[in-house]
């Protein structure tokens, strides 16, 4: 099934209704829960979190760092979903995201892999159906394409 930008955006936005950002305890929990899922299911990627390379889900749960980081990642995903209909703004946000992450020297393949991780998290908390997952993967495919183009144009490793 082929979806247009508006359909993809709408499906992604809908999938995030139960994972809102904010200052209330539940909002903080929403973001922290992503990192608990991440650290439990993708422990090899903890190397990108200096000082937390050996963290368990329990360590993440008690961490103010991951309370804040969880809000940032959820906000980024909300922004991606909400600006997807404006292709140039979407691509600009992708490039800015890449620029902010340069210092971490991330494997360029991780830009697409993130969407597998994120949709897995949404599935694990009951926030995702098959159509929404397909929408996130379509958005992720475009995110990755722009990421790789920007990395290449910046003379950085790319796939």
UniProtKB/Swiss-Prot annotation:
Expressed mainly in a subset of neuronal cells and in head muscular tissue. Induction: By hypoxia. One of its GO terms (cellular component) is cytoplasm. Heme binds at residue 101. GO terms for molecular function: heme binding; iron ion binding; oxygen binding; oxygen carrier activity. InterPro entries: Globin, Globin-like_sf, Globin/Proto, Globin_nematode, Mb-like_M. Keywords: Cytoplasm, Heme, Iron, Metal-binding, Oxygen transport, Transport. Residues 1-152 form the Globin domain. Its main location: cytoplasm. The keyword Metal-binding applies. PROSITE patterns: GLOBIN. It comes from the Eukaryota. It is found in: Cytoplasm. May be a globin and may play a role in oxygen transport. Belongs to the globin family. Homodimer. This is Globin-like protein.
